[in-house]
Amino acid sequence: MKIVLLVVGKTDSKLMVQATEEYIRRLSHYVSFEVEVIPDVRLGSKLSSEQQKDAEGREILARLRPSDSTVLLDERGREYSSMEFSAFLQKKMLIGTRRMVFVIGGPYGFSPAVQEAVTDRISLSRMTFSHQMIRLFFTEQVYRAMTILNHEPYHHE
């Protein structure tokens, strides 16, 4: 299975980039994982928040394939423990999911079109974090899930 983290806007923090890249490197042992960045539409534009969400939504939908299993990372999504998340990923692998796409939206969330197109939502926390931090936290959780599934001593209950 290939896992894609589709994100709106680039990360400008070198520390976040380095830490995220370290987990991506570690993940290469278990699963194909890539981060795909959609350019931030707000730079130099005078779009309203709704117009910005719609523009980002069109870019998100253009990158999704009909066969993808797509999950929005959304504060209103279902919360999982690390063990539950690893079971969620394992189930997707066992049913033969070829490409799983997790989407981090822009600062105003997801457009109605994206919300209608995708049924699965996961919340990493009810707290608010920067999109840069969520990339790191999510990548670490995928790595943690892979170590759980492979019975390796990274996660402790």
Curated annotation (Swiss-Prot):
Protein name as annotated: Ribosomal RNA large subunit methyltransferase H
Q: Which Pfam families match?
A: SPOUT_MTase
Tell me which positions the record assigns to the signal sequence.
none
Q: Which reaction does it catalyse?
A: pseudouridine(1915) in 23S rRNA + S-adenosyl-L-methionine = N(3)-methylpseudouridine(1915) in 23S rRNA + S-adenosyl-L-homocysteine + H(+)
Where in the cell is the protein located?
Answer: Cytoplasm
| UniProt EC number | 2.1.1.177
User: What is the name of the gene encoding this protein?
Assistant: rlmH
Q: Name the species this protein comes from.
A: Porphyromonas gingivalis (strain ATCC BAA-308 / W83)
InterPro entries attached here? Alpha/beta_knot_MTases, RlmH-like, tRNA_m1G_MTases_N
Task: State the Gene Ontology terms under molecular function.
Answer: rRNA (pseudouridine-N3-)-methyltransferase activity
Write out the GO cellular component annotations. Answer: cytoplasm
Query: What does it do?
Result: Specifically methylates the pseudouridine at position 1915 (m3Psi1915) in 23S rRNA.
